Structure formats: C-alpha cells, structure tokens
C-alpha cells in the first residue's frame, strides 16, 4: 500500500533542498508531516477505536468513582449536579443530552451497589487506565512497563485529581458569578465572561498536560507536555464545535436510528476525542524526537549503502523464519539510524523492487538474495559507498564482510560488487588488511 504521507514528505524534502537558507521553513513543513507519519505508523486511529469502546464500558464506573471522591470533600458539598452539568456542557456536544440523562440514572443506581460491586466498577476504570497507559507508552516507544504498584498509584492519582480540578473550576465559576451578581466588584463584570469562556479551555489544557507528563513511563519535559496540552485542548474545542454543528444541522443519525441515535453519536464523539488525545501525544513526543531524528537522518546519507545492506540482512534473516519486519522493528534493530534514517533507505529499496510490503504491512524481500548482487544494489539508487577503514574499525560480521568486498572494489568496482547478498549474509568474515592505493575510490569516500 502506498504511503501518501511519505510521498508528501519526499516532495517537501526535495523542495527543502532548494531552501538551504530558510531552515525554519523546512522545519515548519516537515514537522507536521513527521507527526502525521508517526500517527499513521503507530496505528493511532485503530487505538482510538479501541479506547472508545473501552471508555464506553468504563464511563459509568469512572463517573461513580469521581463523584464519590468529589463528595468526600466538604467544600464541594451540594455541587454534584452542577459538576455533572459542567462536565457534559464542556466535554460533549449539546446533541448528546439524552446520553447525559441515562448516565446520570446509571450513576445513581451504581451508587447503591455493595462494596464488592464498587470494587468491580473500580477494576473496570483501572482497566481503561491501563489501556491508555499502553497507548501512551507505545507512542513513546517505552518497552519497560511500570511495576504494578507504581502503575496503580499513577492511575489512582489521575482518577483522584480529575474530580478535584473540576471542583476547583466549578468553585471559581460560582465565585465569579456571585461576585458580579451582587455587584461587589463591578470591575469583574467584563472579566466574568472571559473567565467563564476560557475556563473549559484552561481545565482541558491542564488535564491533557497532566496526561502527557504523568502517564508515559518516560521523563517527558513539562514544556513539551504543556505545548501538547495546548494543542490537544484547541483541537478538542474545535472538534466539539464542529461535531455539534454537524449533528445539529445534518441529522443523518436521527433519520436512520430514530430514538437510538444518541448512542452512535456519542460513540463517534468518544472516537473523535481519543483521536485528539493521541494527536496531542504524538505531537508531544515529536517535540523531543524530531531534532534527533533529523540529525540521524542527515548522517544516514553518508552511510546509506551500509544501512541498505543491513536492512536487507535483517529482512533476509526474518524471512528465513517465515515472517516480515515492520518499519518500527527495523528501527529498533538499527537504533543509530532511527526511524527517519531507516525510512530513507526503505523507499529507494522499494523503488528498486528489492523489497515489498506483505498483506500485514510488514517488509519482505522481493528479490532472491542469491542472485541479487552488491553491484545491483549500488546501481539501483547510487548509494554512496562507505569507508572501508570505518567498517573495519567498528563493524560486526556483516560490516567486515562488506568491507572485504569494498576492498576488492579498489581494483575493480564491477568484479568486487558481483558478490550476491546471500553470500554476504551467510559467509563468515575473512579479515584482510586494508589495501591503500592512490586515488582509491572507497578510501576517498
């Protein structure tokens, strides 16, 4: 399947080469495409769908636990109904009022459960938090998960802090309204509308920032989490307004589902909300990884031939086991190149029909390595040859074997690169001294 984001990035990179003096413009074009490519590669749309169904099952337990925590603070007594109104007014479109009524009824019934029933609800809520944890750690490429006790404390902190922040937001709103209503501070009359209008955005920004900073098992810089929170809050408000307008003005679901339209509408809204959350997470992670990825990709061009051989070797090894490798898996096998570096090698290899994607989106060899030579690889995309001395110094078996062939190429490029990739991958390295000759092509490189 063709990758439209990758194709766009290639075109933008070509344009960027002509804008050598305008680095900020190249970054402004390439960074959003970098985020979009990571979003696609991390299967965020599929993860958003999974999280939507998980949220639908855990929503009543979450509200029950949140209201219980909220009621435990005397300062918030009597504000339960106002908190629910605040929650639904600012987090869901106006067209899902029917869902609000049903959820309030469900929460009221859940409040009468026994201790065992409440524990079961808590498990449902924690399972949803665990699903969020997996999605976030996949975005940050975190392999090691938290210890169970540490993870439970993080989840419980999120469940506890959310009602408190909402209660504080509601308390500030009530204070501003009461002050202006009784005319104690006329100067606040203009400030009232500003505070009330901006408070949902501020609360959403704080919530998203906390989510991006606390949930990944990774030290996320606070400024990156804050920028991601601002972006997610802005996208969330835009999505809420746009989706609310669509449902109100284009009543497709009401015409099809009738009285049951609220359920698919609410489910779609949950899906859009999680898409926004994951976009913000990818943006937050990209703020830290983009500069490193650019640096690695810049160095990859000088080492592209070696990396191409190594990528083909990893695919050859995986194919002997009857499987392919994803881009992410190849990036983990070649961490020095990074994702952008590996992608810069995969694209020309695919154009040369040396590799292809299988039905599962994994890379596999498309040529028989016993008949595909180093010369074929060199001529396919004119990869620059690496230094033999550098390969000898720090290389592994594959690098040493490649160095043998390049050393032979000093006396004849065609004969030296006539060796097949299968020979490179199966033969043990034969250590030979580096032959230094005048005007040696590989040494000059």
Swiss-Prot record:
GO cellular component: plasma membrane
Residues that span the membrane, as ranges: 56-76, 112-132, 152-172, 195-215, 225-245, 259-279
Compartmental location: Cell inner membrane
Membrane topology term: Multi-pass membrane protein
InterPro entries listed in its UniProt record: UPF0761_bac (IPR023679), Virul_fac_BrkB (IPR017039)
Disulphide connectivity of cysteines: none
Keywords: Cell inner membrane, Cell membrane, Membrane, Transmembrane, Transmembrane helix
Protein family: Belongs to the UPF0761 family.
PANTHER family (alphabetical): INNER MEMBRANE PROTEIN YHJD, UPF0761 MEMBRANE PROTEIN YIHY
Protein name, per record: UPF0761 membrane protein Mlg_0521
Record lineage: Bacteria, Pseudomonadati, Pseudomonadota, Gammaproteobacteria, Chromatiales
